Amino acid sequence: MGLEKSLMLFPLLVLVLGLVQPSLGRESSAMKFERQHMDSAGTGSSPTYCNQMMMRREMTNGSCKPVNTFVHEPLAHVHAACSQKNVTCKNGKGNCYKSSSALHITDCRLKGNSKYPNCDYQTSNYQKRIIVACEGNPYVPVHLDASV
């Protein structure tokens, strides 16, 4: 009888694992934001900073991401933007927020003559406010919409 129950439950187990498994290795939007935009320990001061970081953070796999911004502040300062002034996102959604103060950022822009797999970036440092889209519970940044 124990074997019969096991054989009856086996298809159910396979179904549950089939539904759960695809999400196991998936990067959340908040984790992707951190990977693509956070560098709290860095300064972005080297001319090769963007080339190194874009490769290290997997934004040159298969193609060159044209533009990216790294934030050189504690993650808590960036999370704090989600409780600041609400602004409309570039895509028209209403879940964007502007940081209350300027943050140290590095903009990486693909140079005009650069092509995959030799992605070559211009590195520029600024002190600017950032606009982030926030989602979830807890409410955290999931997209860097702009720097102003």
Swiss-Prot record:
Cellular compartment(s): Secreted
Species of origin: Gerbilliscus gambianus (Gambian gerbil)
Enzyme class, first EC level, given as a word: lyase
Protein name per UniProt: Ribonuclease pancreatic
SUPFAM superfamilies with a match to the protein in the record: RNase A-like (SSF54076)
EC numbers for this chain: 4.6.1.18
Signal peptide bounds: 1-25
InterPro entries listed in its UniProt record: RNaseA, RNaseA-like_dom_sf, RNaseA_AS, RNaseA_domain
Protein family membership: Belongs to the pancreatic ribonuclease family.
Disulfide bonds: C50-C108, C64-C119, C82-C134, C89-C96
Subunit-structure text: Monomer. Interacts with and forms tight 1:1 complexes with RNH1. Dimerization of two such complexes may occur. Interaction with RNH1 inhibits this protein.
Catalysed reaction, written as an equation: an [RNA] containing cytidine + H2O = an [RNA]-3'-cytidine-3'-phosphate + a 5'-hydroxy-ribonucleotide-3'-[RNA]; an [RNA] containing uridine + H2O = an [RNA]-3'-uridine-3'-phosphate + a 5'-hydroxy-ribonucleotide-3'-[RNA]
GO biological process: defense response to Gram-positive bacterium
